[in-house]
């Protein structure tokens, strides 16, 4: 893992793509992953503030992960939680567009709503957990 030769790097986000493009719902998500998630991640990487290393395609430096106590169990968005913990601890989080991981997207409206509710609720949990002041 070339990225982890740098002692400041704690995690690397990869390029998540939808593999099951089987209907309008999954095709829409495939487009969304390209435009929203991956373009946004490139911009956040340029600013040095990636907020989520996706569970589908992410690499974590073992020493950093152990220092932070492993994967958190108290939020629904453990990937986002751990990413924020890495940044808070002073680690750098990078993005590698050539590291591609295929994920299975929800293929029903009900499944999509459940996923997005989980993501939104998990984000709110992380905001509360890492609030300051």
Identify the function of each model-found stretch:
Residues 1-76, 113, 117-128:
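Long helical/loop segments within the catalytic core of UDP-sugar-dependent glycosyltransferases
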Residues 22, 46, 83, 103-105:
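Short secondary-structure boundary/hinge segments and terminal tails
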Residues 25, 83, 93, 109-110:
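Internal amphipathic alpha-helical segments of the cytochrome P450 catalytic fold
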Residues 44-48, 97, 108:
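Short amphipathic alpha-helical segments at helix-loop
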Residues 55, 95-96, 102-114:
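Catalytic cores of eukaryotic secretory-pathway lumenal/extracellular enzymes that build
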Residues 74, 83-101:
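Catalytic donor-sugar/metal-binding loop of nucleotide-sugar-dependent glycosyltransferases
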Residues 129-133:
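Hydrophobic helical membrane-anchoring modules
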């Amino acid at each position: 893992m070339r990225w982890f030769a740098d002692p400041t790097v704690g995690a690397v986000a990869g390029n998540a793509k939808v593999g099951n493009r089987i209907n309008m719902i999954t095709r829409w998500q495939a487009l969304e992953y390209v435009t929203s998630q991956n373009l946004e991640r490139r911009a956040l990487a340029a600013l040095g503030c990636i907020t989520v290393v996706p569970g589908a395609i992410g690499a974590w430096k073992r020493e950093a992960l152990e220092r932070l106590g492993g994967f958190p169990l108290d939020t629904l968005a453990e990937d986002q939680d751990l990413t924020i913990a890495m940044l808070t601890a002073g680690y750098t989080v990078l993005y590698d567009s050539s590291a591609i991981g295929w994920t299975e997207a929800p293929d029903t409206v009900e499944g999509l709503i459940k996923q997005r509710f989980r993501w939104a609720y998990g984000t709110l949990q992380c905001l509360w957990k890492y609030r300051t002041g």
